[in-house]
Amino acid sequence: MAFTCSDIFKIILAIILPPLGVFLERGCGADLLINILLTILGYIPGIIHALYIILKY
């Protein structure tokens, strides 16, 4: 699987602000709400979920 420039940009954003990376990848939906909740509960789970979403789709 090759990474594009936009994927790398989304990964950097996911490390800084996880919900923003998920929003750019999947839009406003259940994945975004889950990521916001995970980020509120703990920053690291939010990052892990964001990276999973970006790398999966």
Swiss-Prot record:
Cell compartment(s), UniProt: Cell membrane
Cited Pfam families: Pmp3
InterPro entries assigned: PMP3
Bilayer disposition of the protein: Multi-pass membrane protein
GO cellular component, one term: plasma membrane
Membrane spanning stretches: 3-23, 34-54
Keywords, sorted A to Z: Cell membrane, Membrane, Transmembrane, Transmembrane helix
Matching PANTHER family: HYDROPHOBIC PROTEIN RCI2 LOW TEMPERATURE AND SALT RESPONSIVE PROTEIN LTI6 -RELATED (PTHR21659), UPF0057 MEMBRANE PROTEIN ZK632.10-RELATED (PTHR21659:SF42)
Family that this chain belongs to: Belongs to the UPF0057 (PMP3) family.
Function: Plays a role in the regulation of membrane potential. Could mediate a proton leak.
Name of the molecule in the record: Plasma membrane proteolipid 3
Native organism: Cryptococcus neoformans var. neoformans serotype D (strain JEC21 / ATCC MYA-565)
Primary gene name: PMP3
